[in-house]
Amino acid sequence: MGSMSKDQFLPLRCLLKSLIFAFLFIFPVRFMNPFNLLPSSPCQSSDQKTLDMILEKTGDYCERVKNMALFYVCKEKVEDERYFHRKKTLLNFSLSSSEGPKPRRTRKKSYTYDYQLVKKGKELKEKRILLEEDGTEKHEENVEFRPVKYFGKYVVYGPVGFLSKYWQQHFKYEIAGRDVVDGKKAVIIQSTPKTEREENCNYGRVWVDEKDFSILRIEYDPRSIKNYEDELLLSPIGDLRKIVNWTVTYGFEKNGVRFPSQQLVQELYVNNEGQKVLMEKISLNYEGYKFFIVEVEVKY
């Protein structure tokens, strides 16, 4: 092979100089700044911005709900089903079984109320007329809500205790996922109290409409539910722990405000494999809404 002269390397040297010049000139900031060598987390930053925006918008929504003058009536249909199991049957619940044990007895109760809520200024009242009990017609005015183990008052204001501007300072929030509720895209927000308290002790997860930031659903954390007592049944083949699932769905909309369509409470025992035994189911369905006032109160 013949020898190469120095002149033959000139084109290669020129090319290398051009590439080095272009590299340093086009990317000077990124590679000359040592902090750019550290890994970035764009997803985390993006999620925090999204969360901050959601909290601002839902705070505005809750202020609207809180300051609304309301007067409406609807039908409130309550079904309470209690399933009684022998303790021995529960403790021998097979981990390999595809179905839970059958109850030895079932008790069913049902009530239909004419429900009325009136809110004017700071005055808030709810009234019930019992129309039916276990299939028998009734007409009892100003009755107390028939005893069920778990129920909430003033459910339309549930979002306020989670996301109003005042209560936001008492919670820590994070985006827990995304979902679809009744065909509407939603962001799931997990709320956790900064400190334990007696007032407004509930916390859990909230489904927020991506479009208008109204509240589509609330799921209460069992540990925040009053009358809930943690219980553990010990078994040689696996322990059973009692849990309570409580969700409120806001399926009716009027003047930009959402009203409850259903409350569903389920008390269950769950084994180590995630298999469930239903002990009690309470469903409250709201229908036939009639609105007389839904307006923002003007404050001077």
Predicted feature descriptions by range:
Residues 4-6, 19, 41-42, 46:
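Compositionally biased regions
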Residues 38-203, 210-216, 221-244, 252-300:
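Structured extracytoplasmic
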Residues 18-33:
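Bacterial N-terminal signal peptides
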Residues 6-7, 17, 33-36:
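Intrinsically disordered, low-complexity polyampholyte segments enriched for Lys and acidic residues
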Residues 1-14:
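N-terminal secretory signal peptides that target proteins for export/translocation
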